[in-house]
């Protein structure tokens, strides 16, 4: 509902935005960007992005590969260099890079309306599915059948996170100082409970300082928009982003909606490194801070998000719905899910529409790349923390936090270990890490196996 409302509001403002937002077609007309073929119609582009949204399973790597196939290989709507520059730019941004890449491609082809259409079509199919699954989970999650299915899903999710850890580490830890950044990040979040935003800022500052100066080749054309246009774009989208939160503060009777709007707005600014990285911070706040969900429910939500199309960060919608449902039932749950979607994805349009004209310029700024690389190294430590946090809460029924001065350590009760989860996790590790089975297949097999074990025991 929130996304539909956003579409209607934006359509009403398109004429206003057109004054301040320069489309990709306008940039090309000025000769500031590389040429690329244009789709025959807006309908063709919308159909292509709808196909991407419906088939975008398997996480960002698979989603980006699908977009490359459709946008570059099949239709030649973007050149290889344009696609890679846009991907590098989206990797610099907080939020789901695949959704932002789709938004950029739509913007480049058909301006603001194209960007909105592409971004919404990427998100809406998965958002609808997640909402339906969250409703089923809220009403029937305590049934033995559902509990058995999620026994296997939790074990599979644990190995999926470990697999993500290996992949990010292989890409990010290319020098000793990045290993150091990862280690400091892990100690900071696991033993000192430092907030994730602080870790991101510290890593970005370190990477910015150790990087070299900008390249002074003079080969990069300046952006095709003025600073005034960019500032106006930022202002418009900040108003669109923040207006619902202001209204909630003024009129909402349920404090949970205000808390959700503020928390997930903050989360949208620091979601560097993908959903896995920010899950640790989100779990820390949602489980221990607000008390909206239990640790097991966080695992269940991630498992559901892994099996649906769209960005993995849609797990936030699951969290928002359950938070609202737990306080005020279905109506408040739906409202909370809408608020969560709004403040999670509206910022993505802000980043793209404000920053897209600067992509070629940014690709030649090594300090920005250095900051991103250091953040990615820190993400390795954060995902390691997430892996241990998930493992302890999935395998052990009882965990105690022991405080040693400024340090805090989670101490499990080894007698409370669930051997069924251990067996399922080992099986998932073999299939996913050794034989490289697909994530949806492993999740479905783990769910069926979990149900069987739960029934037998």
PLM region spans:
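Conserved beta-loop-alpha segment that forms the PLP phosphate-binding cup at the N-terminus of a helix
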Residues: 100
